[in-house]
Amino acid sequence: MTLILGIDPGSRITGFGVVRETARGCEYVASGCIRTGNGPLHERLQVVFRSVREVIRTHGPTTLSIEQVFMARNADSALKLGQARGAAIVAAMEEGLSVAEYTASQVKQAVVGTGGADKQQVQMMVMHLLKLTQKPQIDASDALAIALCHAHTQQSLVPHGLVGARRRGGRLRL
């Protein structure tokens, strides 16, 4: 059994989701939102770092799966998002986790079946796949979807002997 931590990074709200990958599929472990408040950016990044580290220490995942930065219309927002991602990745690396990164369209494709799915479609499929009875918060459901994406990607690579391969530009490199 493998525990996967999915992170949907944000400078104000960072979603997290932990799933257990078993021979029968994935099971829900935990999810939630890290709310950083309205303080200066460096203080909010510290909250992301410490909170992600605490989630890791509480649940013991072996892998962090995180969404890649997309090109936002607002450059300032994209930079803050990138810094929040960095804080989460450093927390994971400090705790010895491997890190996997996925684009938003890869996550949507893996969970919903189409890269153009909206947040509500992702949320409903997360509920269905993990057999949840209540809707998780949007940021938490996105994080669970990122974790599910990693689990599905790993399952599809194992039969082909490509688990250790590196993904660059949409291609797998051995």
UniProtKB/Swiss-Prot annotation:
Q: Which cofactor does it need?
A: Mg(2+)
Positions that bind Mg(2+) 1: D8, D139
A Pfam family cross-referenced in the UniProt record is: RuvC
Top enzyme class of this protein? hydrolase
- One of the GO biological process terms: DNA recombination
- Annotated EC: 3.1.21.10
- Give the keywords, sorted: Cytoplasm, DNA damage, DNA recombination, DNA repair, DNA-binding, Endonuclease, Hydrolase, Magnesium, Metal-binding, Nuclease
Would the keyword Magnesium be found if you checked this record's keyword annotation? yes
User: Cofactor note from UniProt?
Assistant: Binds 2 Mg(2+) ion per subunit.
Q: What would be one Gene Ontology cellular-component term for the protein?
A: cytoplasm
Question: Which amino acids does the record list as binding Mg(2+) 2?
Answer: E67
Q: Which InterPro entries match?
A: RNaseH-like_sf, RNaseH_sf, X-over_junc_endoDNase_Mg_BS, X-over_junc_endoDNase_RuvC
List the Gene Ontology MF annotations in alphabetical order.
Answer: crossover junction DNA endonuclease activity; DNA binding; magnesium ion binding
Matching PROSITE patterns: RUVC
Lineage, top-rank taxon, reads: Bacteria
Chemical reaction(s) catalysed: Endonucleolytic cleavage at a junction such as a reciprocal single-stranded crossover between two homologous DNA duplexes (Holliday junction)
Q: Where in the cell is it found?
A: Cytoplasm
Give the family this protein belongs to, as stated in its UniProt record. Belongs to the RuvC family.
**Could you tell me which PANTHER family the record lists for this protein?**
CROSSOVER JUNCTION ENDODEOXYRIBONUCLEASE RUVC
The record's note on quaternary structure and interaction partners says:
Homodimer which binds Holliday junction (HJ) DNA. The HJ becomes 2-fold symmetrical on binding to RuvC with unstacked arms; it has a different conformation from HJ DNA in complex with RuvA. In the full resolvosome a probable DNA-RuvA(4)-RuvB(12)-RuvC(2) complex forms which resolves the HJ.
Write out the function statement from the record: The RuvA-RuvB-RuvC complex processes Holliday junction (HJ) DNA during genetic recombination and DNA repair. Endonuclease that resolves HJ intermediates. Cleaves cruciform DNA by making single-stranded nicks across the HJ at symmetrical positions within the homologous arms, yielding a 5'-phosphate and a 3'-hydroxyl group; requires a central core of homology in the junction. The consensus cleavage sequence is 5'-(A/T)TT(C/G)-3'. Cleavage occurs on the 3'-side of the TT dinucleotide at the point of strand exchange.
In Swiss-Prot or TrEMBL terms, this protein is called Crossover junction endodeoxyribonuclease RuvC
